[in-house]
């Protein structure tokens, strides 16, 4: 079994918060990170945001909304993205074990979300050089991102996290260059599976998969376009 990436052996405190303003959730993350550094528990926040654009540290001016829509600038990695209703956002506030391996941490988050998609009947992959979880291009369509990941690690503690598109309004992504990637698309579980998949339908399985991946119960496997994860259905 793969070792846990966490420095604590205690269970992760999973909190389902409903809908939370982005700035309020960001402050809550910082407060929880301070508490974790002081010896508090690892925490996983699961929630939705009112519609908002957020920009990571590498966002370029031309990737922002063309109409001047306000953007919240953050201290996470990555570029610009959208959060809003119908998208499950997860913020793991985790103390990482030494030696720190941020790439492994991101791969574990991807693994968890790939499993959730597979259990729903959707084959997803990793795309080399691009974080997140992707539906491979087919029938003339490009690769499509169904889950985005952008994290920050400070004092060996993680902040920010992932966003899984369930039944969100995909048109909101048209005003930006999502994650700075112009040659790929954005999709949702509902769009790909052609049936409604709401946040409430996946929140429990996401919580379980993330905890299992971080603790090594769910091992990281190869999920490239040439080695797709098998559907569980």
From Swiss-Prot:
Keywords: Acyltransferase, Cytoplasm, Transferase. It is an enzyme of class 2 (transferase). Residues 57-66 have a biased composition (Basic and acidic residues). GO terms for molecular function: lipoyl(octanoyl) transferase activity. The record marks 145 as: Lowers pKa of active site Cys. One of its GO terms (cellular component) is cytoplasm. GO terms for biological process: protein modification process. It comes from the Bacteria. The keyword Acyltransferase applies. It is found in: Cytoplasm. It catalyses: octanoyl-[ACP] + L-lysyl-[protein] = N(6)-octanoyl-L-lysyl-[protein] + holo-[ACP] + H(+). Substrate binds at residues 76-83, 148-150, 161-163. Pathway: Protein modification; protein lipoylation via endogenous pathway; protein N(6)-(lipoyl)lysine from octanoyl-[acyl-carrier-protein]: step 1/2. The active site is at 179 (acyl-thioester intermediate). It holds the Pfam family LplA-B_cat. Its EC number is 2.3.1.181. Residues 57-77 are annotated as: Disordered. Catalyzes the transfer of endogenously produced octanoic acid from octanoyl-acyl-carrier-protein onto the lipoyl domains of lipoate-dependent enzymes. Lipoyl-ACP can also act as a substrate although octanoyl-ACP is likely to be the physiological substrate. In the reaction, the free carboxyl group of octanoic acid is attached via an amide linkage to the epsilon-amino group of a specific lysine residue of lipoyl domains of lipoate-dependent enzymes. HAMAP family: LipB. Belongs to the LipB family. This is Octanoyltransferase. It comes from Mycolicibacterium paratuberculosis (strain ATCC BAA-968 / K-10) (Mycobacterium paratuberculosis). The lineage of its organism: Bacteria, Bacillati, Actinomycetota, Actinomycetes, Mycobacteriales.
């Amino acid at each position: 079994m793969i070792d846990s990436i966490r420095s604590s052996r205690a269970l992760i405190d999973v909190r389902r918060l409903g809908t939370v303003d982005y700035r309020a959730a960001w402050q809550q993350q910082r407060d929880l990170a301070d508490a974790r550094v002081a010896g508090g528990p690892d925490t996983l926040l699961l929630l939705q945001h009112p519609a908002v654009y957020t920009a990571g540290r590498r966002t370029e001016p031309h990737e922002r909304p063309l109409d001047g829509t306000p953007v919240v600038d953050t201290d996470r990695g990555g570029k610009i993205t959208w959060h809003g209703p119908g998208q499950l956002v997860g913020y793991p506030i985790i103390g990482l074990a030494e030696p720190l391996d941020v790439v492994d941490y991101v791969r574990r988050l991807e693994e968890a979300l790939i499993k959730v998609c597979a259990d729903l009947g959707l084959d997803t992959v990793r795309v080399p050089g691009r974080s997140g979880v992707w539906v491979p291009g087919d029938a003339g369509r490009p690769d499509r991102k169904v889950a985005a990941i952008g994290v920050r690690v400070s004092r060996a503690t993680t902040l920010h996290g992932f966003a899984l598109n369930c039944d969100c309004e995909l048109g909101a992504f048209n005003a930006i260059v999502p994650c700075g990637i112009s040659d790929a698309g954005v999709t949702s579980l509902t769009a790909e599976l052609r049936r409604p998949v709401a946040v409430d339908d996946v929140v429990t399985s996401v919580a379980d998969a993330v905890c299992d991946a971080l603790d090594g119960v769910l091992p990281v496997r190869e999920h490239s376009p040439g080695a797709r994860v098998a559907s569980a259905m």
